[in-house]
């Protein structure tokens, strides 16, 4: 009889344990929105260990975890069909999420994506040596910087995807991004330093002084003033919204005329360099 009761008790304990780790639903949890369009379910009550249960589904993969807080912060983990491990870390103040994928050993990082509340994000992919091989930085306004073929020294290919067109260039080992547009003898270079500071330069290989173009960059107004034979012809403004506008000077090169017009195609940008 004692063995029978002991067996019943063990079965009930297993059932209780199973219920404790079962998926959360709208009845026993609260839904919390996270940066990156993700949602986490937080249990309304603490478990037997005094912690709140967390449940989230990312890319059709169910992740589970626990937290001392009931606001949605904490760490959730899961495993993909290929045995690779997934980890989602939610900041205490819900200001950012970090989504990581590891190899089967749970230590070797395959990829990492950090997303902030303003919808900006940084995503990295890693090679066998654990070095960054690809990187994508998405700004809050949706424009982004894409880095590929990153070598051990940090250099690689670069691409800036703006609202309507794309600029291409290189990433230097010191973290400087250089994006170039060429039109005839003129080369426009947009440089983005590791700190985020932007500078723009114009070089012209034309040897005829009367038609040779020069550029003067004003960092305060983010404006490149283009001149021909020392006479101003137009302004290119690189706005905080990551757009480019063009406005011409009068024939004397002293006053701007008309209104600044947003450049929406690469063809229009090249035309502004003529």
From Swiss-Prot:
Outcome when changing residue 216 to K: In strain: Goe 2, G25, PWudll and TN
Keyword Lipoprotein among record annotations: yes
Gene that this polypeptide is encoded by: ospA
Lipid-linked residues (S-diacylglycerol cysteine): 17
InterPro entries: OM_lipoprot_Borrelia (IPR001809), OM_lipoprot_dom_sf (IPR023322)
Something else known: The sequence shown is that of strain B29.
Lipidation sites (N-palmitoyl cysteine): 17
Database matches in Pfam families: Lipoprotein_1 (PF00820)
Protein name in UniProt: Outer surface protein A
Endpoints of the signal sequence: 1-16
Key words of the record: Cell outer membrane, Lipoprotein, Membrane, Palmitate, Plasmid, Signal
Organism: Borreliella burgdorferi (Lyme disease spirochete)
């Amino acid at each position: 009889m004692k063995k029978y009761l002991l067996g019943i008790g063990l079965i009930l304990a297993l059932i209780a344990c199973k219920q404790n780790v079962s998926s959360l639903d709208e009845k026993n949890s609260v839904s919390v929105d996270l940066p990156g369009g993700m949602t986490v379910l937080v249990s309304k009550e603490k478990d037997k260990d005094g912690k709140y249960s967390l449940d989230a589904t990312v890319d059709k993969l169910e992740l589970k975890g626990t937290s001392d807080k009931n606001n949605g912060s904490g760490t959730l983990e899961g495993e993909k069909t290929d045995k690779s491990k997934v980890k989602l870390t939610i900041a205490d103040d819900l200001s950012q999420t970090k989504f990581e994928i590891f190899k089967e050993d749970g230590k070797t990082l395959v990829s990492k994506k950090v997303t902030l509340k303003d919808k900006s994000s940084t995503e990295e992919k890693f090679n066998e040596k654990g070095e960054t091989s690809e990187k994508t930085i998405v700004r809050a306004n949706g424009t982004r910087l894409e880095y590929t073929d990153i070598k051990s020294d940090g250099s690689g290919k670069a691409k800036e995807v703006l609202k309507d067109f794309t600029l291409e260039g290189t990433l230097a080992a010191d973290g400087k991004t250089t994006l170039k547009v060429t039109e005839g003898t003129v080369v426009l270079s947009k440089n983005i330093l590791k700190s985020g500071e932007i500078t723009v330069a114009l070089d012209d290989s034309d040897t005829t002084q009367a038609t040779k173009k020069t550029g003067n960059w004003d960092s305060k107004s983010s404006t490149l003033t283009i001149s021909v034979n020392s006479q101003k012809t137009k302004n290119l403004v690189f706005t905080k919204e990551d757009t480019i506008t063009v406005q011409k000077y009068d024939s004397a090169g002293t006053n701007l005329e008309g209104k600044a017009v947003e450049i929406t195609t690469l063809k229009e940008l090249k035309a502004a360099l003529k």
